[in-house]
Amino acid sequence: MYREITAVEHDRFVSESNQTNLLQSSNWPKVKDNWGSQLLGFFDGETQIASASILIKSLPLGFSMLYIPRGPIMDYSNLDIVTKVLKDLKAFGKKQRALFIKCDPLIYLKMVNAKDFENSPDEKEGLIAIDHLQRAGADWTGRTTDLAHTIQPRFQANLYANQFGLDKMSKKTRQAIRTSKNKGVDIQFGSHELLEDFAELMKKTEDRKGINLRGIDYYQKLLDTYPNNSYITMASLDVAKRLEKIEKECQIAQSERIKSLELNREKKVKQHQDTIDRLNKEIDFLKEAQKAYDRDIVPLAATLTLEFGNTSENIYAGMDDYFKSYSAPIYTWFETAQRAFERGNIWQNMGGIENDLSGGLYHFKSKFEPIIEEFIGEFNIPVNRLLYKASNHVYALRKKRNS
């Protein structure tokens, strides 16, 4: 038996489960307002056994497609529950004239650090879930090999509070964070007051990567939808302050070099000259930056984080590549996670990575020593058997063309 439930009922069930995630929060459909939505509870008598926030996409000729991101929330180890829920979902799908229902449960096939990933066995829970979903009538799309083949990433990099810390990271990552601090990069946390700078950094990221992301209206919608469970982390540089500081350092180095010359200390002379050259290089860079940006405080990197239950998601991140030598993105992402854990979250998802654990996303996120999580992937629940295969084939072609 199933029925429509309130947002409070749904969020309570999801938050009390071991599958808590942002995409199954009752507020997420407000972000995806180009889809319809429904909150359904599934019951055995008076006992709720599952919950689903369902997105509904209208299709031509009055048909629809249903999508349950990172859900439904239920005990996948219980075949009876899985069978009942899928039966009820099909019944609901028929009322919506759905061709099929797509879901990608928050169940893992692997959860392990990167160095042990290849040789680690599959999680028993994941294998059981795949088996039960298939036995209940769902079609599994398999262990897809490309990030673009699924709606949600099948692989992600996740940081856990009980395993997170600067001491857990490589010497190179620690050095990058230290460099950023030493160069005067400042971190602040905020919300709407940082939106314009955040959107500008995202636009720079779009231009650099040649991709289309979102605009300021969408980022504002995220903050508005999760007003008490969102924050922007912004790294910035006070260019004038930094310039003044290193000009003074350069003067000191020049004085020390003269003293060393007088004392005939050749090694010290060279050390001071190297320092002077390094500082002059940065002085020239900052003077050019002042001309180019026409502002003293310049945003370097930023992230936008949303929370639900005791979980946190780093949803969007941007940077200004002009200041890449200041290592601001690494510092920003570190502080973003640190903030998440200070706010009581048990994990902070850094988002999807390439399925073969290579490429830019993986290379950057692996610097933080995350847990690599492989999901069981997508499942299709056929509703209209007559049209399901043809419509799913068309969907797959469109997905491939748009990836």
PLM region spans:
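A conserved beta-strand-loop-helix scaffold within acyl/acetyltransferase catalytic domains
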Residues: Y2-G45, I49-G62, Y108-K110, G126, ...
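Active-site/acyl-donor-binding loops of N-acyltransferases
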Residues: E4, S17, K115, N119-F164, ...
